[in-house]
Amino acid sequence: DHHHSTDEPSESSKPCCDECACTKSIPPQCRCTDVRLNSCHSACSSCVCTFSIPAQCVCVDMKDFCYAPCKSSHDD
């Protein structure tokens, strides 16, 4: 059965974003436009998914910063 551990999140579940768009306002309004399969990153509070299989999900949270890029952790 699925249960969420209360331990420190692993490296892979830390919020990260490769495609991040910010406005030029102060403070900036930033939104991560990464498309992920079946879920959004761990810190996302507003996750919007398509009804396809697998679902394509985008986090629509507005932040005043961008998360660290995901790519750096696993280079091909």
Swiss-Prot record:
GO CC terms: extracellular region
Positions bearing the site annotation: Reactive bond for trypsin: K24, S25
GO molecular function, one term: serine-type endopeptidase inhibitor activity
Protein's recorded name: Bowman-Birk type proteinase inhibitor DE-3
Residues carrying the site annotation Reactive bond for chymotrypsin: F51, S52
Record-annotated disulphide pairs: C16-C70, C17-C32, C20-C66, C22-C30, C40-C47, C44-C59, C49-C57
Source organism (scientific name): Macrotyloma axillare (Perennial horse gram)
Keywords assigned by UniProt, alphabetized: Disulfide bond, Protease inhibitor, Serine protease inhibitor
Cited SMART domains: BowB (SM00269)
Keyword Disulfide bond carried by entry: yes
Cited InterPro entries: Bowman-Birk_prot_inh (IPR035995), Prot_inh_BBI (IPR000877)
Keyword Disulfide bond annotated: yes
Family: Belongs to the Bowman-Birk serine protease inhibitor family.
Source organism superkingdom: Eukaryota
Coiled-coil parts of chain: none
